Amino acid sequence: MVGCAEYKNAPMKLPKEVAQELAETAKKLVAAGKGILAADESTQTIKKRFDNIKIENTVENRASYRDLLFGTKGLGKFISGAILFEETLFQKNEAGVPLVNLLHDEGIIPGIKVDKGLVSIPCTDDEKSTQGLDGLAERCKEYYKAGARFAKWRAVLVIDPAKGKPTDLSIQEVSWGLARYASICQQNKLVPIVEPEILADGAHTIEVCATVTQKVLASVFKALHDNGVLLEGALLKPNMVTAGYDCTEKTKTDDIGFFTVRTLRRTVPPALPGVVFLSGGQSEEDASINLNSINVLGPHPWALTFSYGRALQASVLNTWQGKKENVAKARAVLLQRAEANSLATYGKYKGGAGGSTAGASLYEKKYVY
């Protein structure tokens, strides 16, 4: 007779106290009405942002800008966590206050970008793999000591039906890399945000995006399972299901809501606490409206919220212009945008926050950061 011993052909379980901490942190990150501020732009990417407002990309200016963001009073009402670039995790403002302390003052959980960028996958037509697994465990330990409680790793795929993209090889590579990263993070008490971004590049229809996104997410969750990742202590950061940027058919926001929700229901286990969408180059306003269209289709088995970078910061940067006298106005803009997205998580955003400038597209082809 077969006894009740545990099945041995399975990954080792996390210690109970670690699993509990991860699950609690993940739930806090997707608390009702809150989302995540993605402020993890690399030094090269923030240079592009600063070039647009004609300020120099110096350590001091980067610290001043992050101080503007994190020092916004009341931000914690709408923002649960902030993803930081490594430099920012250890940085101080002009007054000598660590920037992470500003987040703590608002009850915002610090997180950290841990991937090391993209490289081409051999034997593919420039499809990408993400670097950064080497030494990740040691880095996670240091990030945890510095106050980080979650991490983010971005993988990228492109849709090109004529070239068969994404190939099965690239989907497999992306899925396995995300799963290994997630497992390493959890072993070191960091909640992993799993980001398989399908870029908006291309002229494909929304139906094609739905098919590809479904295939990718199914592969990702299979890999997470195979690597013993605790779903209750992880979050997913996917693209919304939209048509390609160059598609001639204008996509309605209701269709984005329908196809996105259908795709998630077909692929994402309810054990996962939440999904934090990336904005993917949508305008600030579109990112809020489309998130609203997703949430009006609830109730859902997971929290569906936001993890926006450009869609929270574009108008803030344009208002700030690198000038101290504009900091208060820029912070007011950030609060307005954060509140709009908070309302969208309830399906109660009516549109109009930020005026006409919030409708400007933030799309960048082959976006890297």
Swiss-Prot record:
Beta-D-fructose 1,6-bisphosphate binds at residues 49, 279-281, 307, 310. It is a peripheral membrane protein. Keywords: Cytoplasm, Glycolysis, Host cell membrane, Host membrane, Lyase, Membrane, Schiff base. PROSITE patterns: ALDOLASE_CLASS_I (PS00158). It is found in: Cytoplasm; Membrane; Host cell membrane. It is an enzyme of class 4 (lyase). GO terms for molecular function: fructose-bisphosphate aldolase activity. The active site is at residues 195, 237. Pfam families: Glycolytic. The keyword Cytoplasm applies. It catalyses: beta-D-fructose 1,6-bisphosphate = D-glyceraldehyde 3-phosphate + dihydroxyacetone phosphate. The keyword Membrane applies. Its EC number is 4.1.2.13. Pathway: Carbohydrate degradation; glycolysis; D-glyceraldehyde 3-phosphate and glycerone phosphate from D-glucose: step 4/4. D-glyceraldehyde 3-phosphate binds at residues 42, 45, 113, 195. Dihydroxyacetone phosphate binds at residues 40, 152, 237, 279-280, 309-310. GO terms for cellular component: cytoplasm; host cell plasma membrane; membrane. One of its GO terms (biological process) is glycolytic process. Plays a key role in glycolysis by catalyzing the cleavage of fructose 1,6-bisphosphate into dihydroxyacetone phosphate and glyceraldehyde 3-phosphate. Belongs to the class I fructose-bisphosphate aldolase family. This is Fructose-bisphosphate aldolase 2. The lineage of its organism: Eukaryota, Sar, Alveolata, Apicomplexa, Aconoidasida.
